[in-house]
Each structure stands twice: as structure tokens, then as C-alpha cells.
């Protein structure tokens, strides 16, 4: 047996079926090369056979695979490689360190990717918002020049080296909600502060002209002065002088000091004040030159200060500098007598509101004699064709004025208005359409249309008739006589007297010499006194007025006649307002007086006809 053992290892792969291989084969292969008889005997023992049987399972696949075909070996080898590789990847016994590292790397990669996407979206959104914001700001700026240097993009212009015009610095909550929202399309407060601190640190002063927007003055280190007045309007004339004096005081302190003037848009109100300042500092000798210079500097198209009333106030300030040495003057007290509309088409019949900086002074919508009438009823045709007149018969005027005042005409085709100053104007002013604010925005054109404003000095409002025995009697005293019927023996003035001066009236005359009304006898009241509507002479007045003036189409010309009862040979009249209240009586009286166009003369007809 020992002689065969050296040949057994070579025959291990060809063990015949049904005969287990000799124990020495396995022992020699597994246990070593011990060929001693003692070693062989130990290998043939039960324990040795048992160990051999156990160890036989391991080489058996290897032995069988050696006899398989090349294709099977290839398939199994590939399968084994696949399963072994899969086992390495899926085995729970694989090292945890590699998985943790892989997971950490994956998480970091995912976080980095999400962060990149988020940052990109945020940056894109910011850029998109900024682009929209820039477009909005440029759209709001319209024709104004912008400051686009040093990384700034502001609605701001250097009018001179020391005078800056800009739009409202918005975007701060101290300006209120709307002021904060306006920061999206107007100058940003932070950007304005950054600009001033960068370019003019410690050398600037801000002038706020807005009455509708304020902000925390501490944002500009307290160097803010406020001279407020409403948008599309004019300031009190004394405010212009005060502004110029304040700005001059700041500029003369240091040659590098600058004034920064703004309203909301930084154009119209700002232009009025800056043009006045240019006049005050004697940059140019005339208001026209100052306005032309400002318009060219501030706007691309040269249309900065365009409202007629604001242009008028720059010229008013020029007069103050020329005639009053820059000193404020008290307002001249006047009475507003009424209005004439020249070349007035039928579609212009406006209601009227008179106001000043303290509030409304007069309005046809609330006055007792006009509040119940439509505008077509209280505008009446004058003897001259194409002229409409408004006044209050029997009253000294519409309202008393002193200084600045505003006339606003409310019309269905669009409102128009103007600001005037009694100290700077004559008692009679004619304004063309180019001198009326907002008239160019009306729907229908009115070529040649003009508004005449008639004033009177407060002491000469109600002139008297020197040829009359009762020249000293006032209209109020005459109106008291209306409570009792007039004596039937009253004499009626001849028609020739009435036709001699059809357009004159003693109440509405500005000059005593122009007063030509009929005189009052000892037994009757004057038939031409506006308040004496109950005298029989009123019948003749209405008759002559009907013959002289075309009043067809006017309601006020037909209704008053119904209240007059006339019999041939009688000089008495039944009261037209019997049994009605004072308001109805006043309205009827207004229509009676309005039927006679002569009561609407202002005593300047000679000059009026020469026009």
C-alpha cells in the first residue's frame, strides 16, 4: 500500500465511480507528505476518514469542473465572477466605512447640486426683478434726463454744479405704504443717500416740495427743508421768496455746497422753484431764459416746466425782484365781479369754483342763487356775438380776493383752471387757451376761446349814480322796498332812455362815469335797480331786452316773465314770488335780472367793444 501512495495524487482526479478513493490519497493531499507506516495508519483510522470525508466537499466541484467542457467552464466562471462581484456589493458584511463615505459623498453632491440650482434661481429672479425695476424707473422718468455714472442710475440731473433736481426718494416706510411701494419705480432712498454721501458728503441740503409725501429727515442727517404745495398747482407767492432766500443762505456758506430739490416727479414743481432760484441768483436776467435753461437741462425734449400757471408764477417772481426788490408784498384786496367767455362754443358751459390756499371761497354748486340751476341757466349771452357772461345780479361780486387764488371751471368735456395773484395782475385779464391749465386735454377743440376775469378794487365795488337824487342808496336798501307794492302812479322811463345805453348798469359799472342808469323820482323806485323787480318799469326792461338780445334756448329768459302780471294803463305788478320761500324767490329774481343782458355789463363796454 505504501508502494502505491506516491502514485495516488496523480490519480486523484480519476477516481472510479462506486469506489471511494483510498484514504491515503486524501491524507497525502490534505495533511502533507508523511509516508511513514505510523502516519498511514493514523490516516486510515475512523477520525481520519471522517476528516477526509468532510474535506472531500471542497475539492469536489473543482474536480468535476476540470472534466466539464470549455463552454461550461466559461459560463460558470462568468457566473461565478458575477455572483462574487454582486456579493461583494450586496454583502452586509462588507466594510461600513466605505458605505458611509459613499453616502456622505452622495449627500454632499446632492446638497451642492440643489444649492447651485437654488442660487441660480434666486440670482435669475433678482436679475429679472432688477431688469423690470430698471425698465419701470425709465418708463416713469419719461423725458427726464437720468444720472448714470459711477454705477448709479437715478432720476437726477445737475441743473448747475450746485443745483440738483431729482425725483422723490422713495422706498422707505417713513414715507408710508405708498411711498414704500413707489420705491419700485422711483429713486430708491438707499441709492440716493449713497449717491449724496459719495459725491457731496457733508455738503448737501435737500428741499422737499411735496405736500403728499414726507420721510424721516434723519435719513439725510437732518439736512432737509420742506416747502410744500400741491401737485399741478402753484405755491403761495411768498413761499417762492422764502425758498430762494433759504437756498441762497446755504449755497453762500461754502462754494462746494449743493441744494437738492425734489417734488414727486422732480419736474414741474421742482422746475418752478429752481427757475425762481436761478432768477434770484442772477444766472439769467429774464424768467424766459431761466425756464429755457432748466427745460433743456432737465428734459431730453425740453419740456419740463409746461403748466401755464406755474410759468406765470415764475414771471410773477421776476416782477417781485424787479419792482419790489425781492420783498413779499401784501395781497391786494379785490372783488371778483364775474367772467366773460369769448368765442365760446355751445358745448362750453362750465360751473365755477373759486378757492385759495385756505379753501373754497365760492362755488356755483353751493351758492344759494345758482346751486339749483344747471350751468346752461346761469351763463347768458352778451350783446356781442359769441360772448357768454356770468355774474350775480344785485350783488357786489362773487367773492372777495387777496393775493393768490384759483379759478376752476368744471365742464363735461374736461376741467380747466388757472392760478392768479391780485397783486401781480390788472383788474381785467384775458387768458387764452394756452394760458389755462388742462385745457389742452379736453376732448373737443375750441379755437379762439378766451376767458376774461373781471376784478374791482374793494373800495370801488358798488359805484353810485351821482345824477340821481338817491345816489347814496345801496342795493340792500333798495331791495328792502320789495316787501311792499309800488304805487300805481309810478312813471315809466321812456324807451329812448333805455335804448341809449343798453349795456350799462350802475351796479356792475367799474367807473362812476360809466354809470347811466335811470333816476328815481320822488314817487317811485328806480326801474333799473336790480333788486326792484316788482316795479312796473321791469316790464319795459324785459320787453326791450327781448328785442335787443337773442335769448332763445335759454331757460332763464322765459321763466321769469311768467311771474309778471301787466295790464294796459297800469303800472302795478303782482309779486312773482308770493307764497314761496326765500330760496325760490332768489332764484326767480336771478332769472328776471338775467333776462336783461344789460345787468351783466361791467362798465368797461367801450374797451370791450374795441377788442
UniProtKB/Swiss-Prot annotation:
SMART domains found in the cross-reference section: PTEN_C2
UniProt EC number: 3.1.3.48, 3.1.3.67
Keywords from the UniProt entry: Hydrolase, Lipid metabolism, Phospholipid metabolism, Phosphoprotein, Protein phosphatase
GO biological process entries: peptidyl-tyrosine dephosphorylation; phosphatidylinositol dephosphorylation; response to osmotic stress; response to salt stress
InterPro entries registered for this protein in UniProt: C2_domain_sf, Dual-spec_lipid-protein_phosph, Prot-tyrosine_phosphatase-like, PTEN2A/B_C2, PTP_PTEN, Tensin_C2-dom, Tensin_phosphatase, Tyr_Pase_AS
Active site positions: 263 (phosphocysteine intermediate)
Signal peptide stretch: none
Lipid metabolism among keywords: yes
Positions with biased composition (Basic and acidic residues): 495-507
Domain Phosphatase tensin-type: start-end pairs: 145-324
GO MF annotation list: phosphatidic acid binding; phosphatidylinositol phosphate phosphatase activity; phosphatidylinositol-3,4,5-trisphosphate 3-phosphatase activity; protein tyrosine phosphatase activity
Physiological role: Binds phosphatidic acid. Protein tyrosine phosphatase that also exhibits lipid phosphatase activity. Hydrolyzed poorly p-nitrophenyl phosphate (p-NPP). Can use PtdIns isomers as substrates. Removes efficiently phosphate from the D3 position of the inositol ring, less from the D4 position and not at all from the D5 position on monophosphorylated PtdIns isomers (PIPs). The presence of a phosphate group in the D5 position on PIP(2) isomers reduces lipid phosphatase activity.
Protein name in the entry: Phosphatidylinositol 3,4,5-trisphosphate 3-phosphatase and protein-tyrosine-phosphatase PTEN2A
